[in-house]
Amino acid sequence: MNAPDKFAQLLALTREPFPASTKNYLIGSRPDVRVPVRDIALTNGEQVSVYDTSGPYTDPAAEIDVRRGLPSVRGAWIEGRGDTERYEGRQRVALDDGSKSEDAARLAQLRAEAAALQRAPLRAKSGASHTGNVTQMHYAKKGIVTPEMEYVALRENGRREWMAQYQQDAAREQRLAGNPMGASIPKIITPEFVRDEVARGRAIIPANINHPEVEPMAIGRTFKVKINANIGNSAVTSSIEEEVEKLVWAIRWGADNVMDLSTGKNIHTTRDWIVRNSPVPIGTVPIYQALEKVGGIAEDLTWEIFRDTLVEQAEQGVDYFTIHAGVRLAFIHLTAQRRTGIVSRGGSIMAKWCMAHHRESFLYEHFEDICDIMKQYDVSFSLGDGLRPGCASDANDEAQFAELRTLGELTRTAWKHDVQTMIEGPGHVPMHMIQANMTEQLRTCHEAPFYTLGPLTIDIAPGYDHIASAIGAAMIGWMGTAMLCYVTPKEHLGLPDRDDVKQGIIAYKIAAHAADVAKGHPGARARDDALSQARFDFRWQDQFNLGLDPETAQQYHDETLPKDSAKVAHFCSMCGPKFCSMKITQEVREFAAQGMQEKAREFRGTGGELYVPIQPA
C-alpha cells in the first residue's frame, strides 16, 4: 500500500466530530478572520462553547487532502502587509533528510509524494523602504494591531453568553475568585491588549510567514495556559504516516502546539508533511537535524551547518526553534556533581562540542546572527534549558540557574531585534521548590513566557510520569507558566504511540485547566459548573460530552450499566439506586419543599393571621 493511501486510512480515524458537537466560527472585523469554537449541545436545550485546537479536521464541511496540505488561513494577511517577497530558497540536498535516510530510490519516491506540499518560501523585504523584520513583536512595537492579534483576542474570549447563568451569584463568584499570582488578567481580551502584551515581550504569537495554514494563538501568562505535544520519529521506530497521524490525533485532544523532534530517517520530508498539515504552531530543535548532517558526531558540528539548517527549517514554515544558547563552556563543570548530569539532548550535544573544542558555544557567539534569520521569517525563540535538572535531587542548582540568567540576557538581545521569545524550564522539581523556579524566571527573564516540561515532582513513577508531572504542571501553570510541555506514560521508557499521546494530552489539559481556574481566568470555571449541574441532574450524556474525553467517560460508565435506560437512571454502579448521595439530596430538597407547602397551607387555614391566639389545653 502506498503512502498516500496509508495517510487516508489513518486520518479517517480522527475526522469525526466530538459527540453532540458542532464546529462554528467567530467572525472578526474582516470576513477572513474566522476563529473556530466547538459548540456542545446539551440535552436540556443549553449550549456550551469551548476552545478548539483541532483545526479543519473536525469540520465535516472541510475538504482535506493531506497530500496537498491545509488551506491557508493567513496568506492574505501576510500579502496585504506588503513587506515580504517570494524567492527561490535554498536547494534541497540528500543530507537534509539525514545521513541515515532511505536509499536514493525510496527517498525520491517519498519526495515525489510530498511534491504538492512544496511552497516557494517567503522572507522579509529589505532595503531603503523596508526593515527586513516581519515579526508580530515588530508590528506590536510600532502600534500595529495585526489580524493575528485580533484572531487571538477572539479565540481567548470565545463565546461568553452561555456562561452568564453560572455567574449570577455574586457571593459565590467572590468566594471562588482565583489568585492570578501577580498577572494582570482583564475580563475581556481585546486586540489592543494582545498587541501590548506582545510588544512588552510578555506574550508571543508563534506564526512563521511560511506557515500560513496556522490558526494564530498566544502564549503568555495573561492568556489561557497552553500545552505542547511532542511527536517525531527516532532512529529506532516510526514512519512519516504515523507522525502525521500523531499530529492530527494530538490537536484533536487539545494540543495547542506540536514539536517535531524527529531524529531518525527522512527528517526534512517528514517535516514537510507535518507543517503543511498543521493548524497549530510547529516547533523544532534544529540542532537535532544539524547533528544528523554530520553523522551524529557532535564535535563535527559547525556554525555554517547549523545556520544552513535554520534557514532550511524557516523556509519550510517552522514557527519556533528551541536553541540551547545558554549552555556555555563555563557552566559545564557545574553539572559534574549532579546525580544525572546533563539530560537535555540539545544541552548534551552542545556541552560535548564545547568540551571537544574547548571554546564558547557557537550558538551563544552567533546569537545575533540567529536573530537576523529569525526576524526575516517571524520564527520565535524557545530558549532551551539544556542544563535543566534530570531528577529531583538536581533541582534548583547553580547549573540550572546560571543558564537561566544567561537566557535572560539573550532575551534582551532577541527583543532588541524584535524577535518573539519564550523560555524553557524544568524538568524535575519537588513541589516545595516549584515557586522558586517561577519567581527566578520572572525576575531574570523579564516576564518572557515560561514553557516548562512538567515539572515532574517525584522520580518513582515510571509508566505514570504523566501523572507525576501533571501535578507540578498544574502548580507552575497557576504560578505563571504560560505553556506546559506534556509528558506521556512512556517518558523515560520509549517513543510514545497514539494512545500515549492521548493520555499525555488529557493529563496536561487537566493541569492547564486547573491552573486557569486557580488564576481566575475569566470563564474558566463555567464548563465545570455546567458539568456539575449535569451530574446533579443525572444527565449522563451531557456529563460525558462536557468532559475532556467523552469516549472514555462513557466507556467507564457503560462497563457496568450499558443499557440505554441507564443513561436516564438517577444512580450509577458505584452507589446504586439506594445510596446515591445526589439522589438523596434531591429527595431531601423535595421533602423540604413539600414541608414548606404544608406549612403555607396551614397558615392560610388560620386566616392568614401572623399572630394566632394559643388555645387553652
Swiss-Prot record:
Belongs to the ThiC family. One of its GO terms (molecular function) is carbon-carbon lyase activity. Homodimer. Substrate binds at N230, M259, Y288, H324, S344, R345, G346, D385, G386, L387, R388, E424, Y451. Its EC number is 4.1.99.17. Catalyzes the synthesis of the hydroxymethylpyrimidine phosphate (HMP-P) moiety of thiamine from aminoimidazole ribotide (AIR) in a radical S-adenosyl-L-methionine (SAM)-dependent reaction. Binds 1 [4Fe-4S] cluster per subunit. The cluster is coordinated with 3 cysteines and an exchangeable S-adenosyl-L-methionine. Gene3D superfamilies: 6.10.250.620, Radical SAM ThiC family, central domain. One of its GO terms (biological process) is thiamine biosynthetic process. GO terms for cellular component: cytosol. Its cofactor is [4Fe-4S] cluster. It catalyses: 5-amino-1-(5-phospho-beta-D-ribosyl)imidazole + S-adenosyl-L-methionine = 4-amino-2-methyl-5-(phosphooxymethyl)pyrimidine + CO + 5'-deoxyadenosine + formate + L-methionine + 3 H(+). This is Phosphomethylpyrimidine synthase.
